[in-house]
Amino acid sequence: MGSYDHVPAVEAHADADALRATERERLRTLVSADLTRARQLHADDFQLINPLGGVLSREEYLGGIDAGHINYRFWEPEEIVVRQYGEVAVLRYRSSLEIVVQGRHVPRQPYWHTDLYEKHGGQWQVVWSQATGTE
């Protein structure tokens, strides 16, 4: 399978649980606008591809939340599926999300999310995130 080796099952299970918990914590920090903790969970080179295809850096994204331009009202994930390759992991899940962006209210609706995490200094951080709206 190329240069990627799967992590042993026991370790993978523990890491998968830690990744799920980290992603749920990340969502809570974004909804509550806890930017101190959010910065710790987002890598310096983080990028978000939003449902409209826009690309935001970590500072643009978290700065938008800090300024009130992005206001998550509700964000509840369903089952989070994890695929791990050493110190890199991909998470995929559906969620229900309600948000206000630049004053425009987007009512609660379903989205698919794909997130790429890397382990930095013993801590998992999200590096890439993409959200796709569904109906």
Question: Which residues are covered by each model-predicted region?
Answer:
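A beta-strand edge to alpha-helix "cap/lid" segment located at domain peripheries
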Residues: 1-40, 45-135
